[in-house]
Curated annotation (Swiss-Prot):
GO terms for molecular function: small ribosomal subunit rRNA binding; structural constituent of ribosome. Residues 1-27 have a biased composition (Basic residues). Keywords: Ribonucleoprotein, Ribosomal protein, RNA-binding, rRNA-binding. This is Small ribosomal subunit protein bS20. It comes from the Bacteria. SUPFAM superfamilies: Ribosomal protein S20 (SSF46992). PANTHER family: 30S RIBOSOMAL PROTEIN S20, SMALL RIBOSOMAL SUBUNIT PROTEIN BS20C. One of its GO terms (cellular component) is cytosol. Residues 1-28 are annotated as: Disordered. It comes from Vibrio parahaemolyticus serotype O3:K6 (strain RIMD 2210633).
Amino acid sequence: MANSKSAKKRAIQAEKRRQHNASRRSMMRTYMKKTVAAIEAGDKEAATAAFAVVTPILDRMATKGLIHKNKAARHKSRFAAQIKAL
């Protein structure tokens, strides 16, 4: 348990950041699931629209440090390839 005043403050800040990051990560995963669902349904228009929504979200999460930039690039590349194959 935090003993000093500064350690208590840092613990509070860390918990606040953890909750914020969890919310952002959940939002990102939700949009990714929508894209996957559209691809699996074979609906190219819906998949393209979902991809257009999820792309800037992945970029933003990578910029903020929530995910690695290579992970964002990998997801975008795989989504694009799957949509192109429809």
